[in-house]
UniProtKB/Swiss-Prot annotation:
Entries under SUPFAM superfamilies matching the protein: 4Fe-4S ferredoxins (SSF54862)
Cofactor binding summary note: Binds 1 [4Fe-4S] cluster.
A Pfam family matched in the record: Fer4_13
Annotated [4Fe-4S] cluster binding sites: C10, C13, C16, C55
UniProt keyword annotation of Metal-binding present: yes
GO molecular function: 4 iron, 4 sulfur cluster binding; electron transfer activity; iron ion binding
Cofactors demanded by this protein: [4Fe-4S] cluster
Source lineage: Bacteria, Bacillati, Bacillota, Clostridia, Moorellales
Native source species: Moorella thermoacetica
The name this protein goes by in its record: Ferredoxin
Amino acid sequence: MKVTVDQDLCIACGTCIDLCPSVFDWDDEGLSHVIVDEVPEGAEDSCARESVNECPTEAIKEV
C-alpha cells in the first residue's frame, strides 16, 4: 500500500500524524507528508487506511 498527501488540501490538523506517526510527519512548511515509500503490512496498513478515511479535507489518498 502507498499513500500520498495533497499539500494543497492539507490543513495541518495533525489527524494522520496522531493516528499513524510511523507513516506521516510534519514537513518544513508545517504540513503533513508521507515518510515511507510503502506502508508496511499489518497494523501500519490499517492506521494508514484510517488516516485516509479520517482526513477532514480528503488530502490523503491511497495509490
